[in-house]
């Protein structure tokens, strides 16, 4: 197994332009596919999740050209649903941002499609989405366990009408349903069962759909209305914002050991909820400055916070490791959906924080972190989870440094993360 040793870093300073957002990249690839016209996507993320989406689109007959550095893609729109005369089997790795939307999109056309993935993907639920698609007339069959991939879709189009979907597990299910709703036979009324998690991710979806000419009427996140007869039309060019979750590591770094760190590609005008991470850092005492398309974090004394993290579940993980450098006990609540991500992130985070000496309480949907008087070095297991690897890079700011096992798992969203991170070290 590959290991990366991060020696103690005394100061971090500089500017970084964040790679494109994973969740925006895969959404716009699918919207551009379903749209009329050609769409040029710039600042596209080059990572595993995006490669799985691109490979699947190519297999389905979608035409696109990708620049040499893989950050610009020109997609020739399919002008509606994807159909296939031959049986298609698509392998989607552990890419939830490809599995969920494609599962929904492939019910719209005609054909037989099987979606498979890595073993972890077979543990990541999709039942809430499939239940909703079945209400609209989809024919979906599970191949192993009910409610989980792999699955087969016998596509004949979707009817539209009233549909209920659970909102308490993952916002990706609703995102997938929203993106296909305009292409059903009738208007769609979506009613949310339970509390909707990660609302800002739904805002991203609705904003991107609007860019492609489709209106969603949002009734306080309880009900969503999508009128029939709408079509996706290419806006011509789409700039993919920098990934706000990826920005969180550099902002936390600036707050813990700045100097100052300026992150460009996200800012006040961002459509991503994860930029609110900077507000959480500010509550801990960090010195934060906002621009339209940048955020600066400067060093300050950090104190513990107690916060509901439902609105920023991915970036909240960075608060868990930043808490090692704050005075007091930090409590992050309403984070049950950490458990159904790339790994069970709640269990993984608790285990690894204890390795470096933190006192940790792991609840069903919360975690508390109290830093020790002195942090210990350790070899951090990353569970094939990009965010675990990046979060624990913060331990480089401890006097003991840290070892990261399997550092290349960052390829899911940020392949050269550690190179960029160490470049800012003084």
Swiss-Prot record:
Main location: cytoplasm
Location(s) in or outside the cell: Cytoplasm
Keywords: Amino-acid biosynthesis, Aromatic amino acid biosynthesis, Cytoplasm, Transferase
Recorded catalytic activity of this chain's protein: 3-phosphoshikimate + phosphoenolpyruvate = 5-O-(1-carboxyvinyl)-3-phosphoshikimate + phosphate
UniProt-annotated catalytic positions: 314
Binding site for phosphoenolpyruvate: 22, 96, 124, 172, 345, 387, 412
Molecular function GO terms recorded: 3-phosphoshikimate 1-carboxyvinyltransferase activity
Pfam family, one: EPSP_synthase
Gene3D superfamilies from the UniProt entry: Enolpyruvate transferase domain (3.65.10.10)
GO cellular component annotations of the record: cytoplasm
GO biological process: amino acid biosynthetic process; aromatic amino acid family biosynthetic process; chorismate biosynthetic process
EC number(s) per entry: 2.5.1.19
Residues engaged in binding 3-phosphoshikimate: 22-23, 27, 170-172, 198, 314, 337, 341
InterPro entries: Enolpyruvate_Tfrase_dom, Enolpyruvate_Tfrase_sf, EPSP_synthase, EPSP_synthase_CS, RNA3'P_cycl/enolpyr_Trfase_a/b
UniProt superkingdom: Bacteria
Function, in words: Catalyzes the transfer of the enolpyruvyl moiety of phosphoenolpyruvate (PEP) to the 5-hydroxyl of shikimate-3-phosphate (S3P) to produce enolpyruvyl shikimate-3-phosphate and inorganic phosphate.
PANTHER family noted in UniProt: AROM/DEHYDROQUINATE SYNTHASE, PENTAFUNCTIONAL AROM POLYPEPTIDE
Family: Belongs to the EPSP synthase family.
UniProt subunit comment: Monomer.
Protein name as catalogued: 3-phosphoshikimate 1-carboxyvinyltransferase
Gene encoding the protein: aroA
């Amino acid at each position: 197994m590959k290991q990366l040793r991060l020696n103690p870093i005394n100061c971090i300073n500089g500017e970084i332009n964040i790679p494109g957002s994973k969740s925006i990249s895969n959404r716009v690839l699918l919207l551009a596919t379903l749209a009329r016209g050609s769409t040029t996507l710039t600042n596209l993320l080059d990572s595993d999740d995006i490669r799985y989406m691109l490979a699947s689109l190519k297999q389905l007959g979608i035409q696109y050209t990708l620049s040499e550095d893989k950050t610009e893609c020109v997609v020739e729109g399919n002008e509606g649903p994807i159909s296939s005369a031959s049986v298609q089997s698509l392998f989607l790795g552990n890419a939830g941002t490809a599995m969920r939307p494609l599962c929904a999109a492939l019910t719209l056309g005609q054909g037989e499609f099987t979606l498979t993935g890595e073993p972890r993907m077979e543990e990541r639920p999709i039942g809430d989405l499939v239940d909703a698609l079945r209400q609209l007339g989809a024919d979906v069959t599970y191949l192993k366990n009910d409610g989980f991939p792999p699955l087969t879709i016998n596509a004949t189009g979707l009817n539209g009408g009233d549909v209920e979907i659970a909102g308490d597990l993952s916002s990706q299910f609703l995102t997938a349903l929203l993106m296909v709703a305009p292409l059903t036979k009738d208007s769609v009324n979506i009613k949310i069962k339970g509390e909707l998690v990660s609302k800002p991710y739904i805002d991203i979806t609705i904003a991107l759909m609007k860019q492609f000419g489709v209106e969603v009427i949002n009734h306080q996140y309880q009900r969503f209305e999508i009128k029939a007869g709408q079509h996706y039309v290419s806006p011509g060019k789409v700039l993919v914002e920098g990934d706000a979750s990826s920005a969180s590591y550099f902002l936390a770094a600036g707050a813990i050991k700045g100097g100052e760190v300026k992150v460009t590609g996200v800012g006040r005008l961002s459509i991503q909820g994860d930029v609110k991470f900077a507000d959480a850092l500010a509550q801990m005492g960090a010195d934060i400055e906002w621009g339209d398309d940048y955020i600066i974090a400067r060093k300050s004394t950090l104190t513990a916070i107690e916060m509901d993290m439902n609105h920023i579940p991915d970036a909240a993980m960075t608060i868990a490791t930043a808490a090692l450098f704050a005075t007091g006990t930090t409590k992050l609540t309403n984070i049950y959906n950490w458990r159904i991500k790339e790994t069970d992130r709640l269990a993984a985070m608790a285990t690894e924080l204890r390795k470096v000496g933190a006192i940790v309480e792991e609840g069903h949907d919360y975690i508390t972190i109290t830093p020790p008087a002195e942090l210990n070095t350790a070899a951090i297991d990353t569970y094939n989870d990009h965010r675990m690897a990046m979060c624990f890079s913060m331990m480089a700011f401890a006097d003991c440094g840290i070892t990261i096992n399997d550092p290349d798992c960052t390829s899911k969203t940020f392949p050269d993360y550690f190179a960029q991170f160490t470049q800012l070290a003084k």
